[in-house]
Amino acid sequence: MAGLIPQSFIDDLINRLDIVDVVSSRVQLKKTGKNYSACCPFHKEKTPSFTVSPDKQFYYCFGCGAGGNALGFVMDHDNLDFPQAVEELARAAGMEVPREQGRRDQKPRQPTDSPLYPLLDAASEFYRQALRSHPSRKAAVDYLKGRGLSGEIARDFGLGFAPPGWDNLLKHLGADTLQQKVMIDAGLLIENAESGKRYDRFRDRVMFPIRDSRGRIIAFGGRVLGDDKPKYLNSPETPVFHKGQELYGLYEARKHNRNLDEIIVVEGYMDVIALAQQGLRNAVATLGTATSEEHLKRLFRVVPSVLFCFDGDQAGRKAAWRALESTLSNLQDGRRARFLFLPEGEDPDSLVRAEGTDAFMARINQHSQPLADYFFEQLGVEADPRSLEGKAHMATLAAPLIEKIPGANLRQLMRNRLKEITGLDPQQVEQLAQQAPATSSMPDYDPGYDYDAMASYTPDYGDMPQHDYAPVHQEQAWKPNKGGSKKPWSDKPWDKNRKGGKPWQQRDEAPPRVPAPVEPPTLAALRTLLHHPLLAGKVEDASHFADEEHLYSQLLVALIEAAQKNPGLSSMQLIARWHGTEQGRLLRALAEKEWLIVADNLEQQFFDTITSLSARQRERSLEQLLRKSRQSELTSEEKTQLLALLSRNVPAQTPTSSGA
């Protein structure tokens, strides 16, 4: 029966489940101390790094980063959506899943059962049909044939055509005002802010549907056929599409071959499709963003090796360096990354069509550089290691980056190579990394989650998502050459601006220095509360320190209030209340990173953060009242509040019963 699954039932189901039973029915577990271990079912490995904790009712893989509760495991392992996983686990537990009708006051449930999915799927079908039969399709067909694409590849990637005109899709799908509003939310329509006129976002373009890991269409890319700009146009950010997390072609690559050994990262849709046309069905592309740590995390869950294939110009080399930075924190032992730069004026699309698959593969094998070689070669462009000053500068640049590598063996080998170049012992390198200035192009904290992307998303944290059925649907120094052997540096004068450039674009831009990760206090408080929900009961009133403009503070308040209203909920039950949302992803990422770590003085740190947030909100309120008093007359209530703030004796400013 269709309908919403009550949150109370989901809480009860999770409470009844034993994650060891759930996982062991699908994966052979071995008892190791108080936990259980196995080879991870989500990526290839020979040494077990997958751990299940019966105490925490949580699983985590130290190799690929997969983790979550029993419900999440079944979703990922069995390839089920949320309601199907609930049904499966309820059936195993002998429970019947109740259903209830949605209430008017409920907010839209996204992205678990978002109405955007069927709408985007319908739009994709419209574009595909237009490519087959629209009167204006000839330009699109000629373009695709001119790129050497077969009908089979066009079908596999779902290619389509957005006809010229302002309202083709609008007329086809926008039957009423409400439907048009959903189309705007999905990025299919644009609404003029002044006139209110609505029109198709994609017009006269070859269309590339973008799919998530389950094959659901979440966005589109369009390549213009005429002279309009931009040449390539992506869907905007939506509740179901986040550019910094998705990779074009990953779903198609995995669908074609579930046992991939390496994935090629290229720069555009046509590069992915051109390689697929030539039989290389293992390429992906980012969606108008730099390669992020989230991208690498996803890629290394699928394959042990990543090849970055970029243009050899300055932009391509800058993109490669940023990809290298994102790769470092994901380099567990057993993983590898390579870099291939193409001849000037060429891209994978043009090159593979010109020289063929065999020659292109030979180019990869002969000219790609291991990450370590590329790393030291590029730093050698910035710091001339033939002088003592250059050696010191190179050590300063390299040390903090090397310490980002989690794989102990690779990290030590990188230290050893830096010693061969600079003469510094590995211990000195480690010490130098700890002293590095806190300026970096790398994320300031937890590399496993894109917190900046989270900050642009504004759901209602107080709204507990309900769930219904949804479509199923990455003395003389030596210079490493391409083979990795040693050879002396050239006697030619060092030219900092020689071809290839420095790893970053602006000459006056600070070189990359990576500090030890520092987590913002609010995220630390969220993490602590997840592992110790009973702390919420000691907070008297969370609402007074909520900063309406700060997303993490809002989530902290919502989590405290949820734990206070339901004091018996476990950590996993709390996280499940935000399942399928961006805040749920954040909570899970926080829980995964520290679920086996025990810290001292957690309670004191938690209430120190609460006190700090209270003080910050008090200062903000004081500033707002003072500003208003200079512009207009305050009300009696505002005057009383201002006096209280000035005396630092505002009611309810003590957040805990103990006065913390």
Curated annotation (Swiss-Prot):
The keyword Zinc applies. Disulfide bonds: none annotated. Residues 428-442 have a biased composition (Polar residues). GO terms for molecular function: DNA binding; DNA-directed RNA polymerase activity; zinc ion binding. It is an enzyme of class 2 (transferase). Residues 94-115, 425-449, 476-519 are annotated as: Disordered. Residues 97-110, 488-498 have a biased composition (Basic and acidic residues). One of its GO terms (biological process) is DNA replication, synthesis of primer. It catalyses: ssDNA + n NTP = ssDNA/pppN(pN)n-1 hybrid + (n-1) diphosphate. GO terms for cellular component: cytoplasm; DNA-directed RNA polymerase complex; primosome complex. PANTHER family: DNA PRIMASE. This is DNA primase. The gene is dnaG.
